[in-house]
Amino acid sequence: MVDQAVLDKLETGFSKLSSSDSKSLLKKYLSKDVFDQLKTKKTSFDSTLLDCIQSGIENLDSGVGIYAPDAEAYTLFADLFDPIIEDYHGGFKKTDKHPPKDFGDVDSLGNLDPANEFIVSTRVRCGRSLEGYPFNPCLTEAQYKEMEEKVSSTLSGLEGELKGTFYPLTGMSKETQQKLIDDHFLFKEGDRFLQAANACRFWPTGRGIYHNDDKTFLVWCNEEDHLRIISMQMGGDLGQVYRRLVHAVNEIEKRLLFSHNDRLGFLTFCPTNLGTTVRASVHIKLPKLAANRAKLEEIAGKFNLQVRGTRGEHTEAEGGIYDISNKRRLGLTEYQAVKEMHDGIAELIKLEKEL
């Protein structure tokens, strides 16, 4: 049974959301009917509807406004998650199934900007959740420590180009911390959206960063997701970046079991990342197109691309440099997601040259 204090918070939160002019997908799809149907349910990890929606209630300017506290939440609270997923992921219906993992021909993607005129850097990342553990809000301190132990010992077995060092955030020296900040590797305690979702408990316990010696391969442990696996480098050689990521994921997958769902693909804390979990992005200078951000976003939208500021979500473009990535991660294969970004960026560069 969901206890009364939680129910009271839910009722208060629901009326706050209903009377607000929030533009979030949560507000759009959390009808009174759906609310009444879901408010008394809880998963085997004791997660309730409140765990899913509290960030969206606290931050009425959220775009989405919902997180999954554990893998079960996607099924138990499907009446709310499904329409939000369908809306965000371009018509992925509740009868649709995400295709099996397919990285495609890793050698078929090349350098998007051989002359180094436009693209500053290229990055491809994916997220993974470890089977048998809930997501951030439900993790105990002991589980955080156990997961960090598993992840660091797994990563220490990587060889060749992926060989590197794991740095726990707990007890990290000021020097190491500064070095990681200078490299833009260090993640900070979550923003207000993640804070409100209870994704930052026991910080910095269980959190850590691994990177290879070349600083082109990076793993975040227990940031927003259990694992964020990242491949990146300066310039526009998407092919090389993607190849490295695929190699890394395959190596890690031999050693760790990931949380996967037949319908939704790989499971993540935020429903925007479901499926492939792949976000392929460039930091790019398009001075002519970017003179009008609204116009840039409109053109990018035609290619299913998302425009963000230089430092990611909720930031401005510094020095005219934008972060542009694929928007769709669900209902298509990993290769298709990256190819969509590849083709879209190629088009944007072509348009920039024509202006």
UniProtKB/Swiss-Prot annotation:
Phosphagen kinase C-terminal domain sequence ranges: 118-355
A GO term, aspect molecular function: ATP binding
EC annotation from Swiss-Prot or TrEMBL: 2.7.3.3
SUPFAM superfamilies: Glutamine synthetase/guanido kinase (SSF55931), Guanido kinase N-terminal domain (SSF48034)
Tissue and organ expression note: Highest level of expression in the compound eye. Relatively abundant in the brain, the thorax and the antennae. Lowest expression in the ovaries.
Annotated residues for binding of ATP: 121-125, 184, 228, 279-283, 308-313
Enzyme class: transferase
Binding site for substrate: G63, V64, G65, I66, Y67, E224, C270, E313
Domain Phosphagen kinase N-terminal: 6-90
Top-rank lineage group of the source organism: Eukaryota
Reaction(s) the record says it catalyses: L-arginine + ATP = N(omega)-phospho-L-arginine + ADP + H(+)
Cellular component terms per the entry's GO annotation: extracellular space
Keywords assigned by UniProt, alphabetized: ATP-binding, Kinase, Nucleotide-binding, Transferase
Biological processes annotated in GO: phosphocreatine biosynthetic process
Family the entry assigns: Belongs to the ATP:guanido phosphotransferase family.
Name under which the protein is recorded: Arginine kinase
Organism per entry: Apis mellifera
